[in-house]
């Protein structure tokens, strides 16, 4: 919901999980992923108040609950599904926390990349492809390459 800069989903136990769309009005914090504070901040209340605009019965509890964590993202917000410079090591990274919805196709992509390498084909030279059965097209996996050029016309978000 870009009007309130939040996304949410129900959680077990009559709870709701709320995330931020990282609006420009919020203070941005660059953190060291190996050394950062994962305690709640005043941003927790801001997110709860924003979500309460959509769910008035939500109310604002005085007991903070949930998780504070980081997620990985690439420069253009498109994931990397590719081999690495370490032989036999493949990557599915930079998913910006949204690719759980694409898990079946991500598995198909990774399977194709690994099979391509097992057949002694170099994905950097002759890119792997997968068949998209429902629409009858092939998908060239260079779009997800670690070596791809950043698309300057990207939305640089998961919102399209």
Model-identified regions with their sequence ranges:
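Active-site lid/adjacent beta-loop-alpha segment flanking the redox-cofactor pocket in flavoenzymes
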Residues: 1-87
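C-terminal lid/capping helical subdomain adjacent to the catalytic/cofactor pocket in oxidative enzymes
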Residues: 85-160
């Amino acid at each position: 919901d870009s009007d309130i800069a939040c996304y949410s989903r129900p959680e077990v136990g009559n709870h709701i999980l709320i995330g931020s769309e990282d609006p420009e009005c919020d203070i941005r914090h660059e953190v060291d992923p190996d050394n950062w504070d994962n305690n709640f901040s005043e941003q927790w209340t801001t997110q709860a108040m924003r979500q309460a605009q959509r769910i008035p019965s939500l109310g604002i509890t005085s007991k903070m609950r949930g998780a504070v964590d980081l997620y990985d993202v690439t420069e253009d917000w498109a994931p990397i599904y590719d081999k690495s410079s370490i032989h036999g090591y493949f990557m599915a990274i930079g998913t910006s926390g949204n690719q759980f919805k694409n898990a079946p196709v991500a598995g198909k992509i990774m399977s194709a990349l690994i099979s391509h390498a097992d057949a002694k084909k170099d994905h950097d030279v002759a890119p792997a492809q997968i068949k998209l059965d429902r629409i009858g097209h092939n998908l060239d996996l260079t779009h997800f390459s670690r070596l791809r050029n950043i698309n300057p016309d990207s939305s640089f978000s998961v919102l399209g």
